[in-house]
């Protein structure tokens, strides 16, 4: 069965191991174009454009990426609550049609850091944010697909005669690990995004989301986000992991990352679970490495899969066996890793997926 392979682009050269989040211009246009084209040349299907309360606007960045490439698709991270879903629907559909159709998707991030929420003026509590996200996704989908005006009155939004003359088939991605997130994503998302956790925990999360989706008469697909660390031999891959750990540790202690462990006001259930798993042991399932996770504290996608290209592909395909059909992979050396993966890892993932069928598909 075919899979979808996602990367992630940034507007400047920065990762846990090098560059600066806070120093220098926030947007390097030539770098962004090079980064996007590297993904396209390496055979990626789509790239995620992240969201933060102090980051460049994702819709504008997406337009730049789409302009710089011919086939590469984008996944725009968006935090519901600040722009009406009817407006977001028109923005998405317009961008999609202007770039040939079928190249735009949206990833709903409800928000798990109270300080980051407040920077944009959001003081809603955790449960309220997920209720708002669910209502947002419902209105968004209806606006994208309805050929007739409609009215809506809910807890957070009220519209009379809502209608968009420009419509598109925009996939709705979603992420979250709390019970409220499971309820919201299972009811509204097309793709449920998961962080890289051990196989047993991932299988249980997929089971829970599918069970909730059945209650709504829906089927849902799954994405897994990890940070591959690949080298010619397994020993060299683990040596590279140690170099990444050392570089990250030095930057955390010196403040070079622009954030530091303990300063987050995270309410993210998923981030807390990653911290617990990393504290339990540093390596799970032979290759899932928490070395960076343990250093940077609550945050985003930080668990790595370490080994040769063949070993990493096989480790990721074990998640495919559980039902994962989308993989989001990003590196610690962002552009160079993408180029290397295009030579080996991406083809190996596609070839391996064609030879196996994920759980819950084709039954």
Task: Report the location of each language-model feature.
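Glycine-rich, proline-tolerant flexible connector loops at the mouths of alpha/beta enzymes
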Residues: 46-65, 196-200, 328-342
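Glycine-rich anion/phosphate-binding loops
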Residues: 82-97
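Short, acidic/polar
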Residues: 24-38, 174-184, 308-319
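Conserved, mostly hydrophobic/aromatic
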Residues: 39, 43, 65, 95, ...
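N-terminal beta1-alpha1-beta2 module of alpha/beta enzyme domains
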Residues: 1-69, 166-170, 361
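A structural motif
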Residues: 41-44, 101, 189-190, 324
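Hydrophobic faces of well-ordered beta-strands that scaffold small-molecule active sites
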Residues: 3-9, 47-49, 73-78, 104-108, ...
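An alpha-helical appendage that flanks or caps ligand/catalytic pockets
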Residues: 2-12, 119-120, 126-165, 199-321, ...
């Amino acid at each position: 069965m075919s899979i979808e392979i996602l990367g992630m682009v940034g507007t400047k050269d920065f990762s846990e191991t090098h560059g600066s989040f806070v120093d220098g211009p926030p947007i390097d246009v030539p770098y962004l174009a090079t980064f996007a084209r590297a993904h396209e040349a390496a055979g990626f299907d789509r790239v995620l454009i992240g969201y933060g309360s102090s980051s460049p606007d994702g819709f504008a960045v997406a337009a730049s990426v789409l302009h710089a490439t011919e086939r590469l698709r984008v996944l725009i991270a968006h935090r519901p609550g600040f722009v009406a879903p009817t407006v977001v629907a028109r923005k998405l559909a317009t961008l999609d049609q202007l770039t040939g159709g079928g190249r735009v998707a949206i990833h709903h991030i409800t928000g798990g850091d109270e300080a980051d929420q407040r920077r944009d003026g959001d003081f809603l509590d955790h449960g309220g944010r997920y209720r708002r996200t669910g209502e947002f996704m419902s209105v968004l989908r209806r606006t994208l697909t309805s050929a007739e005006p409609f009215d809506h009155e809910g807890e957070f939004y009220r519209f009379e005669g809502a209608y968009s003359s420009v419509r598109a088939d925009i996939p709705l991605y979603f992420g979250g690990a709390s019970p409220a997130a499971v309820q919201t994503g299972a009811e509204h998302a097309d793709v449920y995004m998961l962080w890289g956790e051990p196989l047993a925990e991932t299988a249980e999360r997929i089971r829970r989301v599918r069970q909730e989706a059945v209650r709504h008469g829906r089927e849902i697909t799954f994405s897994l986000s990890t940070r591959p660390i690949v080298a010619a031999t397994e020993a060299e891959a683990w040596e590279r992991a140690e170099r990444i750990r050392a570089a990250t540790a030095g930057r955390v202690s010196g403040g070079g990352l622009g954030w530091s462990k303990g300063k987050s006001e995270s309410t993210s259930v998923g981030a807390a679970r990653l911290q617990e798993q990393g504290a339990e042991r540093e390596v799970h399932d032979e290759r899932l490495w928490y070395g960076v996770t343990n250093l940077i504290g609550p945050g985003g996608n930080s668990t790595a899969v370490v080994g040769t290209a063949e070993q990493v592909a096989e480790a990721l395909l074990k998640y495919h066996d559980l039902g994962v059909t989308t993989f989001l992979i990003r590196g610690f050396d962002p552009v160079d890793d993408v180029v290397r993966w295009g030579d080996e890892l991406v083809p190996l993932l596609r070839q391996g997926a064609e030879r196996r069928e994920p759980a819950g598909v084709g039954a």
